């Protein structure tokens, strides 16, 4: 059933001066109840502030998590998702069991 699928559209966004940010996988559709792992990596910069956003159908971007350093993660919205930052330029978004309310487009950003 279409309603039981979670669609994630991810992309690669480019910064300036050879600085890049990559999200992996680029596109993902997961059924409700399955696990999730999305990875964001930044190249060409050090000590970036990293952010995970979600855009649900018909809504604007919602900040989910932000991190100012390794192991320093703040959550804006309590939910079924979690984030980890195992390395300076890596930020991982995950869920052990997706809910229908997790549906949306996910975007990683840095500053």
Swiss-Prot record:
SMART domains: IGv (SM00406). Disulfide bonds join 40-108. Keywords: Adaptive immunity, Cell membrane, Disulfide bond, Glycoprotein, Immunity, Immunoglobulin domain, Membrane, Receptor, Signal, T cell receptor. Pfam families: V-set (PF07686). GO terms for cellular component: plasma membrane; T cell receptor complex. Residues 1-18 form the signal peptide. Alpha-beta TR is a heterodimer composed of an alpha and beta chain; disulfide-linked. The alpha-beta TR is associated with the transmembrane signaling CD3 coreceptor proteins to form the TR-CD3 (TcR or TCR). The assembly of alpha-beta TR heterodimers with CD3 occurs in the endoplasmic reticulum where a single alpha-beta TR heterodimer associates with one CD3D-CD3E heterodimer, one CD3G-CD3E heterodimer and one CD247 homodimer forming a stable octameric structure. CD3D-CD3E and CD3G-CD3E heterodimers preferentially associate with TR alpha and TR beta chains, respectively. This is T cell receptor beta variable 30.
